């Protein structure tokens, strides 16, 4: 267990990366530990907006091959190692990122769900792809009645996870979630960055254009040439599916940009709702760099 852990989270394009750069300038002896489920993949630094390679300050960024199915359980193991390493070297760890499941598992502890086999994941992915939303929901409901009223028809990610778990273990994911381990840390301080929506949406639009100009298309082309399974997390990073459609000649680049921007804005909208409801004890900040004025340690 560790005390006084700082967590900086918030929606996508809220200014977390710029804030971290400024915190490094202010404090120096800190380690920024990644808490973004897509920024761990080393083949997609542009499309996931990873910070520059500065291993002295930034940890768990671009460290996992895209062919891997990195999980929250593996992240918690790696996180503990990075926090221990930072404290042993007189550096203060700051955990930052916008992956809600990662943050939630860190604070509330993780359910001890056994690992799901790659074969089951592929089978569920195929079912999700070949069935309509309504058909997929009915299928999952027929296997796990506990999802009723807890997972919506549109939440395909959570539906897929529920089907994977009950197929692999014979028990509902909600049964597993009732049995939790001890949290990793005793005390933590959470800062949640939630700027004005119009500012975030504008940043999302401009950031994706910058990604394209910085080589995101070539980056995704190399990823596509790896012939990875479409259900892998790296293949589902924001912007990747849209660029793949462009590379396959299904849509124009302009359409890919527009669709990716729209999908990311919709994701940000869902994040707003999620973060407002999940962490009642966090300190909400409407501008990331306001945190520079605080003494967070």
UniProtKB/Swiss-Prot annotation:
GO BP field: tRNA modification
Region entry Interaction with substrate tRNA, spans: 36-39
Cofactors (names): Mg(2+)
Positions contributing to ATP binding: 10-17
Keywords: ATP-binding, Magnesium, Nucleotide-binding, Transferase, tRNA processing
Keyword Cell inner membrane in record: no
Site (Interaction with substrate tRNA): 99, 121
Catalysed reactions, as listed in the record: adenosine(37) in tRNA + dimethylallyl diphosphate = N(6)-dimethylallyladenosine(37) in tRNA + diphosphate
Record: residues binding substrate: 12-17
Spans traversing the lipid bilayer: none
Described function: Catalyzes the transfer of a dimethylallyl group onto the adenine at position 37 in tRNAs that read codons beginning with uridine, leading to the formation of N6-(dimethylallyl)adenosine (i(6)A).
PANTHER family: TRNA DIMETHYLALLYLTRANSFERASE
HAMAP family listed in its UniProt record: IPP_trans
Protein's name in the database: tRNA dimethylallyltransferase
